[in-house]
Amino acid sequence: RAKTALAAWAHNEAVPLVSVGAAGGKRRAEAMQIADLAEVTHDPLLAQLRYRLRKHHGAARQGRMGTLCVFSREAVAPPDASCGLDTSDGSLNCHGFGSVVAVTAAFGFAAAGCLMDTLVNTNLQKVGGAFKTPKNHATI
């Protein structure tokens, strides 16, 4: 819910935002991709974000949504049964799947780089403590 609130605020205030999807159970950092939230697949965390933005915040149902996302279409690797982990809570956290630092770090670095690129290539004006794009400039 916090991610949804942040994304809704960023969209309403025309502040660039890069969101990061689920890394739990992923092993291949090189499989990471960056796309608009509307184009993301194979990521339940970002699917939930997309659903909540559309249902509760009036986000576009067709075309781009304006939130860039770092994600992976790699299938989640289930935990090794010999580890004896309880994975029954059904939540979207890494519990039971674990995470690989190479994947989480790559996601974070990609998000930071994407946001820096967006800020450098967007004519932003600081207004009232928040960055806003000029009225004649398309948002991401």
Regions from the language model: what does each represent?
Residues R1-A35:
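ADP-ribose/adenylate-binding Rossmann-like module
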Residues L17, R27, E39-I140:
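Glycine-rich phosphate/adenylate-binding loop
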